[in-house]
Amino acid sequence: MAVPLVILRSDIFMEKKLCILAIFLLCICFGRVHAQAWSFEGGIPSRLSASCDKELAISEAYYKDGKKSLEWQFHPNSILTISNSNLLLDKDKADKYGITLWIYNEQPQKDSLQFQFLSPKGHISYQFSFKLSAAGWRACWIGFKHMLGDKKEQEIVQWRIIAPNREGRVFIDRLTFPVKKMNLRTTPDQQMPYNNSLTFRDLWHWCRVWQWEQYQYDLPLPIALTKNERDELHNVETRLDHVLALSMPSKESINDAYETFRKANIKRSLSGFTGAPIVAPDELDRSKGEMSWNDIETMLSGFAYDAHYNNSQDAENKYFLVWDFAIDQGFAYGSGMGTNHHYGYQVRKIYSAAWLMRDKIWKSPNCDNIISTLLFWSALQETRKACTQERDELLDSWHTLLMPKTIAALMQTDERERSRALKGLTRWLSSSLHYTPGTIGGIKIDGTTFHHGGFYPAYTTGVLASIGTYISLTNGTQYEPTKEARQVLKSAFIAMRNYCNKYEWGIGLSGRHPFSGSMKDDDIASFAYLALAGDLSGQGDAFDHQLAADYLRLFTGESKEKEFFKSQGIKAAKAPEGFFVYNYGAAGIFRRNNWMVTLKGYNTDVWGAEIYAKDNRYGRYQSYGSVQIMGQESRKASGYNEEGWDWNRLPGTTSIHLPFELLDSPLPATTMAKSREHFSGACSLECKNGIFTTKLMERDLKNFTSDFVARKTVFCFENRMICLGTGISNTNSIYPTETTLFQSVWEKDGEGVRINGQQKNQLGFHQNMHATEEHPVCLQDGYRNQYYIKKGDVQVQIAHQESRHEKNREFTYGDFSSAWINHGYAPQNGTYEYLVWIQPTAQEQKEIHPLDTYQVIQANNNAHIVYDVITGIKAYSVFEDLQLKDDLLFLEIPAETMVMHKFSDEKVLVSICDPNLNIQEKAYTTKSPSRPISKRLILCHQWELVSESPNAHVEHVGNQTLLDVICQHGIPVEFSLQKK
């Protein structure tokens, strides 16, 4: 949810000494002037004065902090003056400092309060205005950076508020000046539309609601709806009733509403209310009894359930009282509440509750204010226009606000407005469902879904459910999203189906949630909803058979959709099989027979892990070439459990084994490190078999080893993985470097591990071995996977492990069997070679000797080349420009290229990939698109394309063939060649 605060990018390399010096200087600067919170609980502060002393008073009529506020009963053009300690706004302070307060206005007016900041000479260098256009509490937040004024004199000794040219009064509370670090996501609103220029960046989409409010519909409002239009609108509303219907609300949700209401202590006062202050989470202090949007949600939803399902008149009365109070507190049309970021996650039930209460809302005296609030906070106003093609952070909007937008559209009292709003919403949704460029949020061309500038399945769940639900609501009506949009959406569904086994994904794809996250029931239901909206396969069927079959595989209960699909002859799909390339995530997914392997790296455009202050603190190695086997339908069943997990030993990774206090992220805020290397990702042949490769390098940070490098490749054929590593080097002489084979939960009654056929199943077991080609080591983990190591010092253990919780650093414990190749301390050009045989059958073990199934042609820092005997595939991971002497097909292959080929009769099937997205701008998120990369390979003999390819071209020079291939988006280019 939270937008990261500190991002490590591949083009930003901070020198440690400069960082320390900068932090030291900032601390000195901040130490000179302290943020001052002005309290009115003990009377009028001495530094405040007004044009007339009688204008100021302390009031209990309204408050936003404590139980009292400052009442200013002003005369025309009165001045409220506040003296402060000298504040010198150097460049750093001018960029970061500001002021925050809340102002209560009893009646909407057309004028403003003027704020001015004065130098010792009385010069006004900074100023801004605050519109009094709304009644109730409104936030007044602004940094000096965004104020008006000539900004010539930087010393401020006094500031003042100038009243309008009339009599009136306002109440002031929650005043802090100077604020040392203004909230970057300060939200423009009706009162202060220009208090933050950053909100025009799509990254701050939450804060753009007032900007979007200025949009005008370019869709005409119909004079009247036709009968067909009215019927379609009614169908959508009826379906929404069904979606939101509860068989019986939980007593807990109703009880929570009454308990929260009791704590809120809402009382009418003059023209407004007193009660628990409602503020954004960023300034919330629950120890003082303050509340936020989720408390409004708790009260409104609980009272709505009690009123709707139990016919409680008391609940109905309280429902509307809470609405009046919330609007008075600033949860209202045109209000930004200081900052509104991520509010969508806290208001969704407000909308579903409003739908249940819609008839009563339409009859209520405050109907207009309630509906305008619902419309504004749903951000429906953005949909008055089509979605811009470069809109960022779409997953948040789809997930949290698509249903609120839908409900808000249908809450309008005029059916013509409802119809137009729904048309606009569908157009916006359809135009947002396109393949977005660069690393901004949305769906990528390979089906990956992006959030926080990266491939993020944890944010995809819920998104699929929300859009799928909308499609089910609008199916068969004019409001249905376009076929093109649904086709893009399908690619995200298929991708999630591929990288989940059955519902869960691997740790490498987990972002900041390493042991959690899965497809939910609503996501699964949306497979059916999208299928029923129409065929997307091009076969001309009445519905999409592929999605329907996937739904039957994933859904285990009973539903009308399941019954329908089965009646149409659809059978549950088998689990996906093949090798799937997702290079927008530098990832490959290898699948057969209900198991799944997640292979994960990182590069200049793909971050390796998301680490927050309280999330995934030890997740540094998630993308260090991880090779995680999920042999069962869940992580736990596959042997992965956080309790006692050694964060240094994610299978497949090459890592320096650190104490947890050193593995813990050195940055207190967010770390999303990208590499300086481009070459990391996957390639496939016929989507059946594939390669994963990574040029591993570690960043230059505290407790990192900046010269740690390695070159790693995993060749995936059928149910075998050949893992090669070369150039493993670093100067860390304190802690050993390891390549982890496996780490899995050990159970006393389980299979334990096998070493060269001998079972070991005793807690505390540990054995060291040296593997050679003449005497390889054969291991079997407790989950029927076998490991054949041909090079290196191998260590195996069954141990009771002490670990740390990834969020709170508390001690955790668990029993695990583990095996790894020990490269020693400060290795130089270390190597490894091992084969993983995934769940071989008894028949396979009788008929196949796994080490005879492949040949390593080359394994050094220039290239890893393997020939697979069983499939006949030859695969190349080329790190540096390569010239080949004895190859049957290639003479030269350029650096950072993956190639796979297979001969068949007189033809050869070829796949070529560069996983580099080649995005020009290296930033947290960027709209800069993936750019084409030209690759020239030289083939021996004359070859020609069997059929034309838009991305491959051949030219003949003598008895050689120049093969030019255009790679883009990290998508493999596959084609067939034949001898000329």
Residues covered by each model-derived region:
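Bacterial Sec-dependent N-terminal signal peptides
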Residues: 1-36
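Short carbohydrate-recognition loop motifs
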Residues: 58-79
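Extracellular beta-strand elements of beta-rich domains used
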Residues: 142, 159, 173-177, 834
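Extracellular carbohydrate-recognition regions
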Residues: 34-53
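Extracellular carbohydrate recognition
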Residues: 151-154, 163-178, 184-188
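Aromatic-lined, polymer-binding surfaces characteristic
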Residues: 226, 230-520
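Extended polysaccharide-engagement surfaces of secreted carbohydrate-active enzymes
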Residues: 470-909, 913-942, 969-971
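Extracellular ligand-binding interfaces
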Residues: 72-149, 166-168
